Design a protein with these regions (language model features):
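N-terminal cysteine/histidine-rich coordination modules
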Residues: 1-76
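Conserved catalytic cores of phosphodiester-cleaving nucleases, focusing on short active-site segments
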Residues: 72, 96-114, 125
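A short acidic/basic microdomain associated with nuclease active sites
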Residues: 73-92, 98-101
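Short secondary-structure capping/turn micro-motifs that flank functional sites
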Residues: 91-93, 141-142
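Short beta-strand-loop-alpha-helix junction that forms the active-site gateway
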Residues: 103-119, 228-229, 233, 240-242
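Catalytic cores of nucleic-acid endonucleases
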Residues: 110-165
Length: 319
């Protein structure tokens, strides 16, 4: 933890150079005694003398987590933002890593947590009228496939589609992976944009809503899809076993379908339990996406667009 109360009851930041180890400090959550620690690996921080009675803070914070919180805090302060670090939200029974203005929580997530816990924490913020942005550390970065947990970190806007945020301590940057699409075998495609942590972070976080340029990219779809599905079925892949069963119930066999029957192979990501961070209905955009491809000729090259493009195409047809 980076914040504590001093003997006068004022909140102090561990990063302040004037603090002394011999002084007495307490946890703003449980009021228990905390100690100021300095190390060669971790930045200055406070640690509980005994954690038994604290329901707010944990002692398993990594050096990455502490350093990223500190870097974000310094950047926001330098750009004149009203920001609190490790703000105790007693009505929610939780702590926001950073709280900007009156309604935005920033959560630095460097390790895995249960999907249920993520859903609970996110819903608590939403029910209290707060917005939350989860910023992912290295262990949770998106690579070739979306894990179930990563799906629960996805955000969506009409301008850049599905996206998520990452933090890179080594490069000292915040990274946006956006226009995220997923093919029928689970491979993901996306664009990447990065900013230095010294830039105006609030301007950065507004980018998904204010992006003006329509960005696109092309992907190549697989050939002989039924052969790939056959391998997946032989390997007892649960996803394809379920899809084949659904096809049988409709009197179909996936292995008898052509590549054209699977067009387009690259589509919007899906979540069987429902997306945690996305509160708006995506049904309209999904419908527009399908309508667009129903009118397209089959091709192994697929161009991926932001959701606003499909809406614009449909509007042009009616005008």
């Amino acid at each position: 933890m980076l914040i504590a109360k001093n003997q006068e009851g004022n909140l102090v930041l561990a990063l302040e150079t004037c603090l002394k180890r011999k002084e007495s400090y307490s946890c703003p959550g449980c009021q228990g005694v905390v100690l100021l620690r300095h190390g060669q690996v971790m930045c200055p921080h406070f640690a509980h003398k005994s954690l038994q009675d604290c329901q707010f803070f944990s002692e398993n914070e990594s050096a990455q987590h502490l350093s990223l919180k500190a870097a974000l805090y310094k950047s926001l302060v330098n750009h004149g933002e009203k920001v609190s670090i490790e703000k105790v939200l007693s009505e929610l029974g939780q702590i926001a890593d950073l709280f900007v203005g009156d309604s935005l929580a920033l959560e630095v997530q460097c390790s895995r947590l249960s999907q249920q816990r993520l859903r609970e924490r996110t819903c608590a913020y939403h029910q209290a009228g707060y917005e939350v942005r989860w910023l992912l550390g290295e262990e949770l970065w998106l690579n070739g496939r979306l894990t179930d947990l990563q799906r629960d970190f996805l955000y969506f806007t009409a301008k850049i589609g599905f996206h998520l945020w990452e933090l890179d301590l080594k490069r000292e940057e915040i990274r946006l992976k956006y226009l995220i699409y997923e093919d029928i075998f689970g491979k993901v495609y996306y664009l990447t944009k990065a900013w230095s942590l010294t830039e105006n972070l609030m301007t950065v976080l507004r980018f998904p809503y204010q992006a003006e340029r329509v960005e696109t990219y092309q992907v190549t779809q697989r050939k002989k899809v039924s052969h790939v599905i056959q391998r997946e079925l032989m390997g007892k892949n649960p996803r394809w076993m379920r899809r084949q069963e659904e096809a049988y119930l409709k009197g179909m066999n996936l292995l008898c379908l052509s590549d054209q029957d699977f067009f387009p192979q690259v589509r919007f990501p899906e979540s069987r339990q429902g997306f945690v961070q996305i509160r708006q209905s995506l049904e309209g955009f999904e419908k527009l996406f399908k309508q667009y491809y129903r009118k397209r000729h089959f091709s192994y090259r697929q161009t991926l667009y932001p959701p606003t493009f499909y809406a614009k195409i449909e509007n042009n047809r009616h005008n």
